């Protein structure tokens, strides 16, 4: 990703917006920093050598800090297959690095919401002089979503797995809360639901898993199976909605 950013800069980009989420790594942004020639001793990078400033904006849907129980290693490490010992070691390295950064730049990564987003890429963007903002809010602004919702009768959204992390700014909950301002109900269709009914009811009219029967994860994420399950659930929902709109 750092190489892509560098290429964009060399082609004349002056503002780069990076969407953070769904990464395949959880390295605290180390690879990203290295590809932009970040010097871990001085805190300087490729961006510091540019004649004209470049604005980096990180769009994130979570507010995790850089390290600790809610940091990138502890929360996202298991998703990447990290063992307990690897996660503990990575979190300790992240903690030490954050202390060094504070000493170098008086930047406290631990107090910046989203610095642990995308395996720590949020923190890396901050170290390069960038800022973090709500990914949903930015996309909603570009799409003029707030205005569009005012003329809706019902919102249907989705999530691979609806869980407690979803309540930390992820799209399904964020759009449900925006729709709620205009008394527009929201239904969520999910691959799996791992949130208590009471918590889900705070934001959604209803939450449904698309699965039709007991199924393995491998089978559940098969594209053909997923499309079939969504079609079946969507058809049943439309029948239900039509019945109440007679």
What spans do the regions from the language model cover?
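N-terminal loops that bind phosphate or other acidic moieties
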Residues: 1-246
């Amino acid at each position: 990703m750092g190489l892509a950013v560098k290429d964009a800069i060399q082609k004349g980009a002056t503002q780069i917006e990076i969407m953070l989420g769904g990464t395949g790594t959880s390295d605290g942004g180390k690879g990203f920093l290295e590809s932009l020639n970040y010097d871990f001793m001085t805190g300087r990078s490729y961006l510091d050598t540019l004649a004209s400033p470049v604005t980096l904006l990180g769009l994130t849907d979570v507010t995790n800090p850089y390290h600790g129980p809610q940091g990138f290693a502890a929360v996202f490490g298991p998703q990447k297959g990290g063992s307990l010992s690897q996660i503990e070691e990575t979190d300790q390295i992240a903690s030490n690095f954050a202390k060094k950064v504070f000493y170098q730049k008086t930047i406290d990564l631990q107090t910046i919401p989203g610095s642990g987003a995308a395996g720590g890429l949020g923190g890396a963007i901050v170290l390069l002089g960038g800022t973090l903002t709500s990914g949903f809010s930015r996309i909603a602004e570009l799409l003029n979503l707030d205005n569009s919702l005012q003329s809706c009768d019902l919102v249907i959204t989705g999530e691979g797995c609806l869980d407690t992390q979803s309540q930390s700014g992820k799209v399904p909950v964020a759009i449900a809360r925006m729709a709620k301002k205009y008394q527009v109900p929201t239904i969520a269709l999910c691959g799996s639901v791992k949130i208590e009914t009471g918590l889900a009811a705070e934001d959604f009219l209803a939450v449904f898993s698309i699965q039709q029967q007991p199924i393995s994860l491998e089978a559940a994420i098969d594209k053909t199976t997923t499309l079939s399950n969504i079609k079946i659930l969507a058809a049943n929902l439309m029948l239900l909605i039509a019945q109440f709109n007679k």
